[in-house]
């Protein structure tokens, strides 16, 4: 378990109120996913997953998915997935996948929003994330987690705006705080964004 994962889990415990604990996850797994699926008429469901992992293998093929699925009456689904992949060598295959899927299946008066941001970082050499960078990412994760408390009062456009702002902050943090072990060079940050909506 990485130090960042431990800190994130501590953060979840500190911020947990009501449904927050089950509405978010933090992971170092290869496949990161968020799934929101309300099951009763008039219900709302929110899921957020924040992933951070290092990859020192010859293949970079991590997946990041956000799925919002609505199939009841007057319900709402919001799924947000963020994944950061720190590449620690020069791989021969780079095929990361970032997907967002929002589905409204025979749902009257329903709304579904899926947002996925994936960051692949590295210049083909070992790198380390500074303690300052870890702390800054914790703040971003906390801000994303707080969306769960207010999303019922937010429009989809407002949620998209907040996630876009969070993604911009993550990109800035990685560019500044991910340092090559030899102390030189730009780590390089590639970000993909996927958004899907259904109403």
Task: Kindly give the residue locations of the regions a language model identified.
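Bacterial N-terminal signal peptides that target proteins for export
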Residues: 1-8
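Bacterial N-terminal signal peptides
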Residues: 8-18
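Sec/Tat signal peptide C-region and signal peptidase I cleavage site
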Residues: 19-23
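Low-complexity repeat regions of mature extracellularly deployed or surface/particle-associated proteins
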Residues: 24-199
């Amino acid at each position: 378990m990485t130090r960042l994962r431990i800190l994130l889990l501590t953060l979840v415990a500190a911020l947990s109120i009501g449904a927050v604990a089950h509405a978010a996850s933090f992971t170092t797994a290869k496949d990161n996913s968020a799934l929101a699926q309300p099951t009763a008429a008039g219900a709302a469901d929110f899921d957020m997953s924040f992933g951070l992992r290092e990859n020192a293998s010859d293949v970079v093929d991590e997946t990041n998915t956000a799925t919002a699925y609505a199939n009841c009456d007057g319900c709402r689904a919001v799924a947000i997935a963020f994944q950061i992949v720190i590449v620690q060598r020069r791989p021969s295959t780079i095929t990361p996948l970032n997907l967002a899927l929002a589905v409204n299946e025979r749902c009257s008066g329903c709304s579904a929003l899926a947002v996925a941001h994936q960051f692949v970082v590295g210049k083909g050499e070992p790198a380390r994330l500074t303690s300052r960078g870890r702390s800054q990412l914790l703040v971003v994760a906390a801000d994303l987690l707080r969306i769960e408390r207010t999303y019922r009062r937010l429009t989809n456009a407002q949620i998209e705006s907040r996630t876009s702002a969070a993604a911009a902050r993550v990109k800035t943090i990685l560019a500044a705080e991910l340092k090559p072990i030899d102390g030189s060079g730009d780590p390089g940050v590639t970000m993909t964004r996927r958004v899907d909506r259904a109403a």
